[in-house]
């Protein structure tokens, strides 16, 4: 089983435990924090399991998931850039939030199926608890990728009275995402330089890859 798993990933490793979890992305081995976090939890709870970063090329993603479905020792894990959207079609099921925003960041094995979830939505909402955002406060969201979709969905659902600005490098992508929304108090910026023209932003949310490990743009 170890050999076959390594045939689908770029960073080869040896499984130290029978049960294992993965963080799946293009290069999570380059500084992903999830393995360090979860492996400390497993150790403290005396759970014989370990999480590994799995660097996967897009052409091997489908076969990797196919393999993991058959391997009962795989308990689940995380999904990171750039596969939060692409991985959905290979899973057995996804939860309601994932369907809504078309993005998965967590996989769990349940009843011999791999089910996708999105914890970005609720996690982001929880992170805003410490901020006292008033109705008159303006919000700027940068990015419309996997995490960005979750952020945008939460902002649109919970801050309907606030003025909202959105920017994404791919203008067509964010317009497609927002086309069904009520455009009242909603503004989409075409160019990054347009941000400097806004004077009333109270909260800026970075949902881009800038600042993610060694990712710089």
Give residue ranges: language-model regions:
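Phosphate/diphosphate ligand-binding glycine-rich loop within oxidoreductases
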Residues: 2-131
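Glycine-rich adenosine-cofactor-binding loop
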Residues: 25, 116-120, 128-129, 135-157, ...
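Glycine/Thr-rich phosphate-binding loops of Rossmann-like dinucleotide-binding domains
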Residues: 31, 87, 151, 213-215
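Conserved acidic residues
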Residues: 75, 137, 202-203
